[in-house]
Amino acid sequence: MSLLTEVETPIRNEWGCRCNDSSDPLVVAASIIGILHLILWILDRLFFKCIYRLFKHGLKRGPSTEGVPESMREEYREEQQNAVDADDGHFVSIELE
């Protein structure tokens, strides 16, 4: 029998749960890991667009702008922002007439 499973047994015409090893450190650790995994999965599904956009565009460091005129820096920022905005439109809407 696995330490991580609960066994249902008939007790006096009722269904009960017999969990003898619930204080075992391995069971406690597995429960904590399972709960953390569930929380992270839910957060990932709720905020996946923000998270992956941050990883895709936010963590990339652009080239150094040392010695570059401000007008060229602004032009580069606009190009980068347009690239990010273009990525938002990956859904295609089709209108039927």
Swiss-Prot record:
It is found in: Virion membrane; Host apical cell membrane. The keyword Cell wall biogenesis/degradation does not apply. The chain crosses the membrane at residues 23-43. Keywords: Disulfide bond, Glycoprotein, Host cell membrane, Host membrane, Host-virus interaction, Hydrogen ion transport, Inhibition of host autophagy by virus, Ion channel, Ion transport, Lipoprotein, Membrane, Palmitate, Phosphoprotein, Signal-anchor, Transmembrane, Transmembrane helix, Transport, Viral ion channel, Virion. It comes from the Viruses. Residues 44-97 are intravirion. It is a single-pass type III membrane protein. Residues 71-80 have a biased composition (Basic and acidic residues). Residues 59-88 are annotated as: Disordered. GO terms for cellular component: host cell plasma membrane; membrane; virion membrane. The record marks W41 as: Seems to be involved in pH gating. The modification Phosphoserine is found at S64, S93. A lipid is attached at C50 (S-palmitoyl cysteine). Glycans are attached at N20. The M2 protein from most influenza A strains is inhibited by amantadine and rimantadine, resulting in viral uncoating incapacity. Emergence of amantadine-resistant variants is usually rapid. Pfam families: Flu_M2. Gene3D superfamilies: 6.10.250.1640. Its main location: virion. Forms a proton-selective ion channel that is necessary for the efficient release of the viral genome during virus entry. After attaching to the cell surface, the virion enters the cell by endocytosis. Acidification of the endosome triggers M2 ion channel activity. Cytoplasmic tail plays an important role in virion assembly and morphogenesis. Belongs to the influenza viruses matrix protein M2 family. Homotetramer; composed of two disulfide-linked dimers held together by non-covalent interactions. May interact with matrix protein 1. This is Matrix protein 2. It comes from Influenza A virus (strain A/Chile/1/1983 H1N1). The lineage of its organism: Viruses, Riboviria, Orthornavirae, Negarnaviricota, Polyploviricotina. The gene is M.
